[in-house]
């Protein structure tokens, strides 16, 4: 079996598109949530989202790329190329048949779908764009990344709603662990902040209608009222340890465990007792070969909905037992909003940053922690902490649970 290490990462997020900016935002508790600027929100009752700011198209794209790819693909490619640059990978020195891409998306090209349905309605079916399908389908983020970097190995795009990125990272970990690939770009990308996206989740009563960005995404708070939609991408460069050492790569961390299962309970609600998510955490720790006492931090799914935060708190206590009293928990969605299928990508990166720099990112804007949530939540300010192992949880509609276990790298 191969050990699997992280040698690079890239982010496109509401709190920064460069590694240094993203890290500083995590440490200082920057709020990436604000008024929706993309369209008129007056009829939806939802006014806030976590939009990507200062996205530099010019860095990696030409003008026509914006007309040939949906924004979720652009976000994913940007993050992948940033990760490649950090890792120092030279594709001319790789066996490209063992170089893969596993980048998921929960919804895919939602903006493209919306625009083309309107176009067909207004102008007729013959006016639908020829590239509508390849712009809209969710797998194209992985396909477009592979095209851009020349990766000819495994290329998949997992669709498991809000667990998509974490499933992609976990499956990439297993693929390398069992010897099928040397290097895989793994994570998720999403661009759901559209009229139809906001309206759909609002109709489901999943989104908060709070109008104050400081009181909107408040995981574990007694007054939480729904999640704030976000957008962006987060990807890792995963690599076998032997391959990384052979090329002299800088190793940032190690993936040591992965757990995945299904609640088989409800279309959109988690198992109230948290048993499904708990089992996924246990599976990740078992593969890592560690006891719950070793876990120093859990980056919770923590959506700021009543159902999720209550169930996940119970899940952590079920999975860790007495160790849940000492493991620190936070939800970085309080800063980034909920990136749906990309959430596990940027949250995995946040977890890696926490391990590298030995701190716990805060859950910001929490004024009154729900007394029924008794896990050890780090509130409002980051906390210095020495630890070696962490979990990153992602729980999706459909009952999908995915958890990765990361280990701090010691030279």
Regions found by a protein language model. Give the residues of each.
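A glycine- and small-aliphatic-rich helix-loop capping segment at beta-alpha/alpha-beta transitions
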Residues: 20-27, 111-125, 175-178, 198-211, ...
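Flexible, low-complexity linker/loop segments at domain and module junctions
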Residues: 1-6, 91-95, 288-294, 325, ...
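Active-site-proximal alpha-helical scaffold in enzymes
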Residues: 76-89, 138-142, 146-190, 228-249, ...
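Conserved beta-ketoacyl condensing-enzyme motif
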Residues: 6, 22, 27-161, 189-198, ...
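Active-site-adjacent elements of ketosynthase-type condensing enzymes
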Residues: 41-51, 108-112, 191-217, 259-279, ...
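Short pre-catalytic strand/loop immediately N-terminal to key active-site residues, enriched for Gly-Thr
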Residues: 128-133, 153-160, 221-225, 327-338, ...
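Condensing-enzyme catalytic core mediating Claisen C-C bond formation in acyl metabolism
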Residues: 3-7, 30, 34, 212-288, ...
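Glycine-/small-residue-rich "gating" segment that lines the acyl/pantetheine channel
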Residues: 122-129, 167-170, 174, 190-246, ...
